[in-house]
Structure formats: structure tokens, C-alpha cells
């Protein structure tokens, strides 16, 4: 009898993969792109989707079909595999992506709790300790990320987007900035790559395979099929959430021109819509998203 994930378990695994992908960069870049692209928003969004969704999901599929990252890289050359694998793990791990999860989420808490090096150190220690404890059991990530944190994260983003639809800041997008005035799709591709999800996808495929095996699916082809399908679910969720964020960013950019980062764009939007509660909303979104990604990268 052919092994197959149930629809419910497949959805949970897809939610887990989405949670692992959707971190600091995924929150920052789409709204800033929307604010900068203005009336050229949708061509730029198409480019962003190629590099921030298409390539990462392709990485998950490639690793699923090969078995693991080392086997995939060995197709280039046996000596290339260990070097490439180490560089990928370093770049998405301790060198760049993991430290960014704590620093970015803390910055969103500063307006609520204040700043200071001591407070940031305490927060970082607690943040990484909690993430490490969860990541010790990579085969059980679906129980926390897929069942609890991912629905909470999506729900909070939907609340922000619903507020943007119910009380739009403006009826029109602004003119695009100079870099998006021509070839906005190409600029979107370059911008989307900065999420670093293309590299992360090469690592996450193996983690998702572990979660599928933990649900009783042990046959290689069945694990491969489940991983690929979970990748498409995660890609669909990313597409929907990015569309919300770029639209919200475009509206905010028209009212608040010159905002330097996506974090500033989201903060301005949330504060305009919900006041002080908006700051709490955005901080919660960033903390959950960054925690999910940190767990995935450590695992």
C-alpha cells in the first residue's frame, strides 16, 4: 500500500515550512518594495515572487529529490559538496541570518519596552535559549510551528491587512522611485533575493522530511512527494502574505514618503490604523516570525 500524508498533516507540514521561511527579511523587504515601487508595484512584485518564492521552493524540491543537500551538491563534484554545504550553513546560520532574527525582533520592541544594550542582551539570551530548546527536536517542529505559531502569525498579518482594506490610507499609489521607474521586475528579483530564502530552502527541505517521517511516512518516494507538496503549500502562503504586505507598503509609502526600511513602513501603517495597539501588533508579528525562522535555521 502506498504511503501518503493525510490532508490535515500535509497542511500542517506546509504551515511549518512557511513559518521557517517567513522571518525578518520576509517582513521587511515586501512592504519596503511596495513603498518604493508605487504604481509599478505589481511588476516589481512579480520579480520579488521569482527570487523570494520560486527559487526557495525550487531548492526545497531539489533537496527532496536528491535526498539531502550533500547528495545534491555532490552532483557538481565530490569535493564541492562539503565546501558548499558548510558555506550554506554558515551563511544562513551563525554568520548572517540567525543573529538578524534576534536583533530585528528586539528593535520592534524598543518603542514598547525601551532600548539599551543590557536589555537587548537579556532578550537575545532568552530568545536564542528558547529557540535552541525547540530546535533540539526538529522532527517535532510541526507540533509548535505548524499548529500554533504559524496560524497566530498569519492571523496577525491578516488583521493588519484587513485594517488597511477597511480604512485605506490613500486611494492611489504614488509614483515609483528612481530604481523602480524602469525595469521594476528586475529590481524586484534583486530585492527578493535579499531574504536569503534561496539558501535557506536548501536546508529546510531536510528538516521538513524529518517532520514527515515523524508522522509515519517512511518510504523514500512518499517522503519526497510530501516534501514537494508541502513546499507548494508554503509557496502559496508566501505569495498571499507578500501580496498583502506589498499593497500595504504601497499605501503607506504614498502617505509617508521617504521611509528607509520595511520595518518603518509597517510601524507607520500599524500606528496610523490602530495607534499604540498597532505597535504591539507589529512587534508581535516580528517576534513570532523571527522566532520561527531562528528555530528552523538552528534545527
Locate each region found by the language model.
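Select transmembrane alpha-helical segments in multipass membrane proteins
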Residues: 7-17, 42, 79-92, 121-126, ...
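Membrane-water interface regions at transmembrane-helix termini and the short interhelical loops
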Residues: 63-71, 128-149, 214-217
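Extracellular/periplasmic helix-exit of transmembrane alpha-helices
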Residues: 236-265
Amino acid at each position: 500500500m502506498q504511503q501518503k500524508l493525510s490532508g490535515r498533516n500535509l497542511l500542517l507540514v506546509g504551515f511549518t515550512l512557511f513559518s521557517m521561511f517567513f522571518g525578518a527579511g520576509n517582513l521587511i523587504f515586501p512592504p519596503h518594495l511596495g513603498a518604493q515601487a508605487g504604481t509599478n508595484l505589481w511588476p516589481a512584485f512579480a520579480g520579488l515572487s521569482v527570487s523570494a518564492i520560486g527559487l526557495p521552493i525550487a531548492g526545497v524540491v531539489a533537496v527532496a529529490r536528491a535526498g539531502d543537500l550533500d547528495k545534491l551538491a555532490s552532483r557538481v563534484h565530490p569535493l564541492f559538496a562539503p565546501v558548499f554545504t558548510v558555506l550554506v550553513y554558515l551563511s544562513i546560520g551563525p554568520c548572517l541570518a540567525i543573529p538578524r532574527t534576534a536583533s530585528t525582533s528586539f528593535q520592534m520592541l524598543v518603542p514598547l519596552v525601551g532600548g539599551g544594550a543590557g536589555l537587548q542582551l537579556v532578550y537575545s539570551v532568552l530568545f536564542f535559549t528558547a529557540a535552541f530548546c525547540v530546535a533540539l527536536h526538529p522532527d517535532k517542529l510541526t507540533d509548535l510551528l505548524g499548529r500554533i505559531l504559524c496560524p497566530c502569525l498569519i492571523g496577525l498579518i491578516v488583521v493588519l491587512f484587513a485594517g488597511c482594506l477597511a480604512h485605506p490610507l490613500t486611494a492611489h499609489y504614488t509614483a515609483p522611485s528612481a530604481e523602480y521607474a524602469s525595469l521594476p521586475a528586475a529590481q524586484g528579483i534583486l530585492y527578493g533575493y535579499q531574504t536569503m530564502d534561496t539558501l535557506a530552502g536548501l536546508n529546510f527541505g531536510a528538516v521538513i522530511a524529518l517532520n514527515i517521517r515523524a508522522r509515519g511516512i517512511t518510504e523514500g518516494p512518499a517522503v519526497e512527494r510530501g516534501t514537494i507538496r508541502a513546499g507548494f503549500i508554503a509557496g502559496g502562503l508566501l505569495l498571499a502574505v507578500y501580496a498583502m504586505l506589498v499593497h500595504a507598503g504601497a499605501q503607506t509609502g504614498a502617505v509617508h514618503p521617504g521611509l528607509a526600511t520595511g520595518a518603518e513602513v509597517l510601524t507607520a501603517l500599524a500606528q496610523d490604523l490602530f495607534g499604540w495597539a498597532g505597535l504591539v501588533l507589529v512587534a508581535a508579528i516580528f517576534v513570532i516570525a523571527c522566532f520561527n525562522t531562528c528555530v528552523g535555521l538552528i534545527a
